[in-house]
A protein has these predicted regions:
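Short, structurally constrained coil/turn elements
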Residues: 31, 101-102
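Glycine-rich, N-terminal phosphate-binding loop of Rossmann-like dinucleotide-binding domains
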Residues: 89
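Conserved active-site segments centered on acidic
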Residues: 1-82
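Conserved small/polar residues in nucleotide/adenosyl-binding loops
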Residues: 105-106
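Short amphipathic alpha-helical segments
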Residues: 18-20, 97-101
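Alpha-helix capping/helix-boundary segments
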Residues: 92-93
Length: 106
C-alpha cells in the first residue's frame, strides 16, 4: 500500500483539498485499496477545525465530500509512516523539515 500525506500550514484549505481530490481520483480509478491518503498541518493554529468553508464548497462543486475532516498537526510518526509527504509550498517544506529534525528533504 502506498501512503501519501499532504501538508500545509493549517490543514484547513490546501492539504485537505489535495487529500480529498486525490482520494476521489484514486477511487474513480478503482485503486482505493492500494492507497492511504491523508493530510496534516505544520502548525497548531487550526487543530480540530473543519475544512475552510470556501474550500469545502469548491470540493462539493466537484462532487467531493470532506465531511468529518478536522485539522491535525503532523507528527514525527507521520514521517516514518508515509511513503510520500507532499508539502503545498516551500515554507511548508521548510517547516516540515524543521519539525521532523531533518536538514534536507527531497
Amino acid at each position: 500500500m502506498t501512503k501519501v500525506l499532504f501538508i500545509c500550514h493549517g490543514n484547513i484549505c490546501r492539504s485537505p483539498m489535495a487529500e480529498f481530490v486525490m482520494k476521489d481520483l484514486v477511487a474513480k480509478a478503482g485503486l482505493s485499496d492500494k492507497f492511504e491518503i491523508a493530510s496534516a498541518a505544520t502548525s497548531t493554529e487550526e487543530i480540530g477545525n473543519p475544512v475552510y468553508p470556501p474550500a469545502r464548497r469548491k470540493l462539493a462543486e466537484h462532487g467531493i465530500s470532506c465531511e468529518g475532516k478536522t485539522a491535525r498537526q503532523m507528527t514525527r510518526r507521520d514521517y516514518e509512516t508515509y511513503d510520500y509527504l507532499i508539502a503545498m509550498d516551500h515554507n511548508n517544506l521548510r517547516n516540515m523539515a524543521r519539525f521532523v529534525g531533518l536538514s534536507l528533504i527531497h
